[in-house]
Design a protein with these regions (language model features):
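Bacterial N-terminal signal peptides that target proteins for export
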Residues: 1-16
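Bacterial N-terminal signal peptides
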Residues: 14-25
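Active-site-adjacent loops and short helices of periplasmic peptidoglycan-processing enzymes
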Residues: 26-171
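Extracytoplasmic
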Residues: 172-177
Length: 177
């Protein structure tokens, strides 16, 4: 009968072989659009339809985080700055935290709730707190996207809820990531 350490070793070998087979498959991942980039060098390892436009959905919140943390870095706000849930933020579709209008949260907590729960209301709270309005914040998002070289991206809201004109590509998201 095999010992526990022997079984554990066999499982490790089986896992390693499985990972190696997946890694060596020419098309290990399938998607309408994909771009696999080596983080340290920027070398493209695999690309399929990397420049076709597509709807960004909740990955929009990565740019919301980027713009908010840039404002912190520039000293315009701090992570302890209080922001208020507006009626517009409170009315966002789920996923959301569901705070009542008038509730105050810190930038830090709003960021955490937005990123962990994908809270659409917190994305709007951050947009209004940093950019003054959804439109003002969307302009900041687009300015930053252009500055980063994201030439196929246009943002119209901070949370990724369906909106005409909100578009990106796998290539542009790789730049942001």
């Amino acid at each position: 009968m095999p010992t526990v350490s022997c079984v554990s070793s066999l499982k490790s070998v089986a896992f390693a072989v499985g990972v190696a087979v997946i890694a060596l498959s020419p098309l290990a991942a399938r998607a309408e659009a994909l771009l696999v980039v080596e983080a340290d060098t920027g070398k493209v390892l695999q690309a399929e339809n990397a420049t076709i436009p597509w709807y960004p959905a909740s990955v929009t919140k990565l740019m919301t985080t980027y713009v908010t943390l840039k404002a912190v870095k520039e000293g315009r706000i701090t992570l302890d700055t209080l922001v208020t849930v507006s009626p517009i933020a409170a009315a966002q579709s789920p996923s959301k935290m569901g705070f009542r209008s008038g509730t105050q949260v810190t930038i830090d907590n709003a960021l955490k709730m937005m990123m962990v729960k994908s809270a659409n209301d917190m994305a709007v709270v951050l947009a209004e707190g940093v950019g003054g309005s959804i439109d003002g914040f969307s302009a900041l998002m687009n300015e930053n996207a252009a500055r980063l070289g994201m030439t196929q991206t246009s943002y119209v809201n901070p949370n990724g809820l369906p909106a005409e004109g909100q578009i990106t590509s796998a290539r542009d998201l790789a730049i942001l990531a």
